[in-house]
Swiss-Prot record:
2-oxoglutarate binds at Y170, R231. GO terms for biological process: cell population proliferation; protein hydroxylation; regulation of translational termination; stress granule assembly. PROSITE patterns: FE2OG_OXY. Fe cation binds at H156, D158, H219. Residues 138-240 form the Fe2OG dioxygenase domain. Residues 1-20, 372-403 are annotated as: Disordered. It comes from Xenopus laevis. GO terms for molecular function: iron ion binding; L-ascorbic acid binding; peptidyl-proline 3-dioxygenase activity; peptidyl-proline dioxygenase activity. This is Prolyl 3-hydroxylase OGFOD1. The gene is ogfod1.
Length: 511
């Protein structure tokens, strides 16, 4: 990388070598005052809130503090900002976040970065240790992040062995609540899960937020809504003995049920005839067995699909918000489903559809389904099975089952991968059928990503598309999430007065 400079680095104006200039950052003078320090210490120990010089403390929803100003000399921060913006930032994106992150600042040699590192992990660490009575190690854990338009960091608690206090130093331009990018703090519900947002802290130049990392320290960086501002911050953790954590509650697994009796006629009423032929099903099964996924366009008959879309736009459907926010945020249709919507749910749960999926995928979702190992010995495709055929299942056979829901997606909705997901540790067939996706763009989010365990690279991405049926077979090492739907989606919603976001029928089938 090259650039125009007035003089060469490490020289004076005549080209002679000069000594390397050392910079020193100083904490705000108010932090050093004994009276202020004693008042903050007393308030922290008593779990009290209040303003103490440049330090604002609050215990709701969990103990945290805001220091402004944090650094004595604002000119130092301007030069620090310039150094930081010259670093290499990498885009980071997964189920939890989207932003740009710098390389580790632990060993950077730039003068202002080095000075900031010293003031944080020496001067401020000692100050924080003193007021909290917590012994903090000298471990340096620090990086820089840029949040631009639509970037976010969703609800999490910062849990990681050794992390004791988190901090964020803001280097932002004039910032207001309407710009987004606030640090949102969550309360806790009766089940020990994050509940509603209780407090939002708007970024401010030369302010530092700190809080204790604990089982209740759930927070997020809300989506940045300003298209012309950069939310620049330096953040990290002070390390020490971690707080003891209570066992986490398990998610209740979705209710599974076997198929409901229905003969083949329901398939002919609903499904595009091109998918019902022997040749089509044999070709689809061959492709599915090779790739473990397939997308079937124009899956339902046009009149049936149009009727579903019309019902979703006009009929009253009871929706319940699904959380908690550290795992998911979307609307689930609840209660009795009216008319054609209920009939579609019935189709997806029907005995005929279970066998139909078996013919598509080679999975044994019905006792009449062909055994792949046996059928491989024959020559050519066999006639697809139908529920009108006679047969009996073995008493030792597992009963195939499914769980399913109708979901509504709109701006700010998402799901996340989490360790206690009861669906993570089984082989399963995922089905997604999309509605109301007119003009939906990939940049809005809302797509379903499949990734391998412990990996960030996507194995497969399923984008919402009208009347498309997505089938994905996942093993125990494959996880999935729905990407956060960002502010760009509201441009599309503003043009469409009939409905916001989109819908999907989401089912999971088990052999």
């Amino acid at each position: 990388m090259t650039g125009k400079r007035g003089t060469a680095a490490g020289t004076d104006g005549s080209g002679n070598k000069k000594g390397k200039r050392e910079f020193k950052a100083k904490l705000s003078g108010l932090l050093a005052e004994q009276t202020c320090r004693d008042s903050v210490k007393e308030a922290w120990e008593g779990n009290q809130g209040g303003q103490f010089g440049s330090v604002a403390l609050d215990s709701v929803p969990f103990p945290h503090g805001v220091i402004h100003p944090f650094i004595h000399n604002s000119d130092f921060l301007e030069e620090l900002k310039e150094e930081l913006l010259n670093l290499n930032f990498q885009p980071k994106s997964n189920d939890l976040y989207q932003f740009k992150q710098s390389e580790d600042l632990k060993n950077r040699k730039e003068s202002h970065i080095k000075a900031l590192r010293h003031v944080l992990f020496e001067d401020f660490r000692q100050w924080l240790s003193n007021i909290t009575n917590v012994e903090l190690e000298k471990t340096v854990d620090i990086s820089c992040a840029q949040y631009g338009y639509t970037d976010t960091l969703l609800c999490h608690d910062d849990e990681l062995e050794g992390r004791r206090f988190a901090f964020i130093l803001y280097l932002v331009p004039e910032w207001s609540k309407s710009d987004g990018g606030s640090l949102d703090l969550y309360g806790m519900d009766d089940n020990g899960q994050p509940g509603p947002i209780v407090k939002s802290l708007v970024p401010r130049w030369n302010s530092l937020v700190f809080f204790e990392v604990s089982p209740v320290s759930f927070h997020q960086v809300s989506e940045v809504l300003s298209d012309g501002k950069c939310r620049l911050s330096v953040s990290g953790w002070f390390h020490g003995c971690s707080l003891e954590r209570p066992p986490r509650g398990l998610d209740h697994p979705p209710v599974r049920s076997p198929h409901i009796p229905h003969d083949d006629q329901i398939l002919y009423e609903w499904i595009n005839p091109s998918y019902l032929s022997l040749e089509s099903q044999a070709q689809i099964q061959e492709e599915f067995e090779e790739r473990s996924e397939i997308l079937l366009k124009d899956f339902l008959k046009a009149d049936k699909f149009q009727a579903i879309c019309a019902a979703l736009e006009t009929q009253s459907i009871t929706l319940e918000k699904c959380g908690p926010p550290n795992k998911r945020c979307y609307d689930r249709a609840h209660g009795d489903f009216p008319g054609v919507i209920g009939s579609c749910m019935e189709l997806l749960r029907s005995e005929a559809f279970f066998l139909f999926l078996s013919n598509f995928t080679g999975l044994k979702l019905h006792f009449l389904a062909s055994n792949n190992e046996e059928s491989d010995e024959g020559e050519g495709p066999s006639e697809p099975n139908t529920v009108s055929q006679q047969g009996a299942s073995s008493e030792d056979d597992k009963v195939p089952s499914c769980s399913g829901e109708l979901r509504h997606w709109q701006h700010s909705y998402y799901t996340m991968i989490h360790d206690l997901d009861p669906e993570r540790h089984e082989f399963a067939l995922d089905l997604l059928l999309f509605c109301g996706c007119d003009d939906w763009e990939a940049e809005y989010g809302g797509f379903t990503s499949y990734i391998a365990k412990e990996e960030d690279e996507e194995l497969l991405t399923v984008y919402p598309e009208n009347n498309c049926l997505a089938l994905v077979y996942r093993d125990k090492e494959t996880m999935r999430f729905v990407k956060h739907i960002n502010h760009k989606s509201q441009q599309r919603d503003a043009k469409n007065t009939k409905h916001k976001g989109f819908w999907d029928f989401a089912f999971v089938y088990y052999e």
